[in-house]
A protein has these predicted regions:
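Short, positively charged and aromatic/hydrophobic N-terminal segments
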Residues: 5, 9-16
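Clamp-loader machinery-focused feature within the broader ASCE/P-loop NTPase space
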Residues: 15-176, 180
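Charged, glycine-rich active-site and insertion segments that engage polyanionic ligands
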Residues: 21-86, 194-197, 203-316, 320-400
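Conserved catalytic/switch belt of AAA+ P-loop NTPases
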Residues: 158, 183-194
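Loop/turn-to-beta-strand initiation segments
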Residues: 163-168, 193-199
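Residues immediately C-terminal
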Residues: 176, 191, 207
Length: 400
């Protein structure tokens, strides 16, 4: 009889928990069902790697999954649920990229930013690394998970569970873990204490060292559907249905991008200004040594903005060129870019982006992203890119 009552109680707890945080997540039904089913069946890998692009919901799902694990084995599931909802459960731990700022002058670790982290997750659960660094006032720096953080993780997980159940460590943007930190955590991830669960979240699994990756069970998240994004914009952001559908087609499966498009993120206006200044100078630079100085000044300006901003800008440039290509090849229904700069007409620019130069342009932009990500000299990288762009834009398309 006691066993039957226990089973009945557990089923009620599971139903209650499943109806809470998981139902706030956009789409990803297959992922949610897989995680819940494996947990109910007692198949809970001790180290899991959630792999998904920005805005796909990896962090919200990791938190919801942690909530399920922690509340499922609690004597008071409602209280446990509430604590996880506030990100204040004593058995839920976080590690994420940080760096020094005005408040934290040295040895930055996640614990010193927990208040800001809770606000960030509450307000931007689908937010990017760039958004996070903006929120702590360091968008001009690169966040990192360093060896000090790794030591903190080890220290936290050596302690017994406060509530006698699981301990969950969520490592967000795990690709930002440097080699020293990864090596410190290697043995712990391979052989964690009993009832300790690691949830590593990444947008780029190739940047995580293989010895860490091989010790985790990988779970790949697809991008969100346009329908899921549109429905969520209507429900969460009070968007009209027509506007939500338009933005959903632009968002490329990224809910974070959709929200910023809806609210017309001011970064895009700055990026548009930088891009058009760059393009105009690149057009004039061929055979005009005086204009080369304009490209040097432009490169210096962007180089001062910080690496995360530079990476965001280069991604914006990729999108701009692709939109121009679509317009050039008579697919205006796929073009969503709305230019705010006076006297710049995308229709007039589009013919300069074509089959003979688009692959080279994309390659050089991606190469620049790669080198900036790896701490290359931004001024030199951007100036080199500018010189190449000057050649590409003057390349003629072959006529048949």
């Amino acid at each position: 009889m006691k066993t039957e009552k226990l089973i009945y109680r557990l089923r009620k707890i599971i139903a209650y928990i499943c109806d809470m945080l998981f139902n706030q997540i956009i789409g990803q039904e297959h992922i949610k069902n897989h995680l819940l089913a494996s947990a109910k069946n007692g198949r809970i890998p001790h180290a899991q790697l959630f792999i998904g692009k920005e805005g796909s919901g990896t962090l919200p799902i990791a938190i919801a999954y942690a909530q399920f694990l922690l509340s499922h084995f609690s004597d008071n599931p409602e209280a446990s649920e509430l604590k996880v909802g506030k990100l204040q459960h004593p058995d839920l731990h976080f590690a994420f990229p940080v760096t020094t700022n005005d408040s934290v002058k040295k040895h930055p670790v996640s614990n010193l930013f927990l208040s800001e982290w809770r606000d960030f997750v509450k307000n931007q659960p689908y937010g990017s690394l760039f958004n996070w660094l903006q929120s702590i006032g360091v968008e001009n720096k690169q966040g990192m998970i360093g060896v000090d953080e790794a030591l903190e993780v080890v220290k936290k997980l050596q302690l017994k569970s406060y509530e006698g159940g699981f301990k969950v460590m969520i490592i967000w943007m795990a690709e930002k873990m440097n080699t020293a930190a990864a090596n410190k955590l290697l043995k712990l991830i391979e052989e964690p204490p009993e009832k300790t669960i690691f949830l590593l979240i990444t947008e780029n699994e190739d940047q995580i060292i293989n010895t860490i990756r091989s010790r985790c069970q990988a779970l790949h998240f697809p991008v969100l559907s346009e329908q899921d994004i549109a429905m969520s914009l209507v429900a969460r952001e009070n968007s009209s249905e027509s506007e939500a559908l338009k933005i959903a087609t632009q968002a490329e499966g990224n809910y974070n991008k959709a929200v910023h498009l809806l609210h017309q993120d001011s970064n895009d206006l700055i990026f548009e200004e930088w891009f058009i200044t760059w393009i105009r100078a690149a057009f004039k630079a061929k055979g005009n040594a005086a204009v080369i100085q304009d490209l040097v000044v432009w490169s210096e300006t962007i180089a001062k903005s910080g690496r995360e901003t530079q990476k965001q800008f280069l991604a914006y440039c990729l999108q701009f060129f692709r939109q121009a290509l679509l317009l050039n090849y008579k697919s205006p229904e796929l073009v969503f870019l709305e230019i705010k700069t006076p006297k710049f007409n995308l229709q007039n620019f589009a013919p300069f982006v074509h089959s003979e130069n688009i692959l080279a342009i994309e390659k050089e932009l991606n190469d620049a992203l790669y080198h900036i990500e790896r701490n290359g000299n931004a001024k030199i990288i951007l100036l080199d890119l500018s010189m190449k762009l000057t050649r590409f834009l003057h390349k003629k398309e072959k006529t048949i």
